[in-house]
Curated annotation (Swiss-Prot):
Protein-lysine myristoyltransferase that catalyzes myristoylation of the protoxin (RtxA) at two internal lysine residues, thereby converting it to the active toxin. InterPro entries: RTX_toxin-activating_protC_bac (IPR003996). GO terms for cellular component: cytoplasm. This is Protein-lysine myristoyltransferase RtxC. Coiled coil: none annotated. It is found in: Cytoplasm. Keywords: Acyltransferase, Cytoplasm, Transferase, Virulence. GO terms for molecular function: peptidyl-lysine N6-myristoyltransferase activity. Belongs to the RTX toxin acyltransferase family. It catalyses: tetradecanoyl-[ACP] + L-lysyl-[protein] = N(6)-tetradecanoyl-L-lysyl-[protein] + holo-[ACP] + H(+).
Length: 167
């Protein structure tokens, strides 16, 4: 499949995703075109029809902070700026998320990933963590804790960042 056909298939999945269908075209351009250009995506097809899509970026800490503050901020050069893996899009509007999960855990069997997860209709997101099938769970948690410390330290250097603690 050529790039334009793949772009059309991904657009079709976006329009069928409850979460993505009302997002602006500018975000589609920001999230999808760099993924295709850097070949950092998976498009699952069944019987000639696209059923799921996932894209990822390899960010450095500085770009990660920029992304946390503004998910629309990634430029093409940011997608391969470091070794901190982030899922950018995860779209499986027809119930094939498990199949996509299985595929990604095999493709990145030794990988550690994070993602900003947003529920449909919510303006808020949260950071979720994922690891490949060959990664020891305890080691993954230690690595994620280290990532979190580095990220919190970098975020705390910003003027507009406030750390709140619950009691």
């Amino acid at each position: 499949m050529d790039k334009f056909s793949e772009l059309g298939s991904i657009a079709w999945l976006w329009t069928n995703s409850e979460l993505h269908q009302n997002w602006p075209l500018s975000l589609f351009s920001t999230n999808v075109i760099p993924a295709i250009e850097t070949q950092q995506y998976v498009l699952l097809v069944r019987d000639g029809m696209p059923i799921a899509y996932c894209s990822w970026a390899r960010l450095n800490l500085e770009t990660e902070v920029k992304y946390i503050n503004d998910v629309t901020s990634l430029k093409l050069e940011d997608w391969q700026s470091g070794d901190r893996y982030w899922f950018i899009d995860w779209i499986a509007p027809f119930g094939d998320s498990y199949l996509l999960t299985k595929h990604m855990r095999k493709l990145f069997s030794d990988g550690l990933f994070r993602a900003i997860r947003v529920d449909a209709g919510s303006p808020n997101g949260k950071i979720s963590e994922f690891y490949g099938r060959n990664v020891d769970a305890k080691l993954a948690m230690q690595s994620f804790e280290q990532y979190q410390k580095e990220l919190m330290n970098a975020l705390s250097q910003q003027d507009n960042f406030i750390i709140s603690t619950s009691k």
